[in-house]
């Protein structure tokens, strides 16, 4: 006997034949991606926005563990500092670090490069306050289904 739930009656079934591109706003460690993975939904980690660097490091470790690319290899230490400042990274999830804080001895060059590499590996737009609609690069909507989540 088939079982039916009230959700079957309340919500229409959604199906797509197009590949799913996931955009996670306030991504944290990627719970939405984990849910899709656990449900067996094939998807692409397309973009995310998370400014808290510990969460970004966790996201990368969970979802992009095989990406050990050094995206900062061709950059000077100064270039990395400027990039992180411009992106508006945070370590407390409440306010962005200032250039002086990023530059300080509290954060080593290795830490700054790891942050930058994690951002690039996770396709992270970082600070949602500085994003615009075009930054989401939602194109080819006839070819892809874009799923945007926030938490």
Where are these regions (language model features)?
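Conserved active-site and SAM-binding loop architecture
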Residues: 1-151
């Amino acid at each position: 006997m088939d079982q039916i739930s009230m959700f079957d009656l309340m919500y229409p079934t959604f199906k797509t034949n197009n590949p799913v591109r996931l955009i996670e706003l306030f991504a944290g460690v990627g719970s939405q991606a984990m849910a899709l993975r656990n449900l067996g939904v094939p998807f692409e980690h397309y973009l995310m926005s998370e400014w808290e660097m510990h969460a970004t490091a966790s996201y990368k470790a969970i979802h992009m563990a095989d990406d050990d690319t050094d995206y900062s290899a061709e950059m000077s230490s100064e270039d990395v500092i400027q990039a992180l400042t411009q992106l508006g990274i945070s370590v407390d999830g409440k306010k962005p670090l200032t250039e002086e804080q990023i530059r300080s001895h509290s954060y080593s060059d290795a830490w700054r490069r790891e942050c930058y590499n994690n951002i690039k590996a996770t396709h992270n737009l970082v600070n949602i306050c500085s994003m615009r609609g075009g930054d989401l690069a939602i194109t080819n909507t006839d070819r892809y289904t874009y799923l945007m989540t926030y938490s």
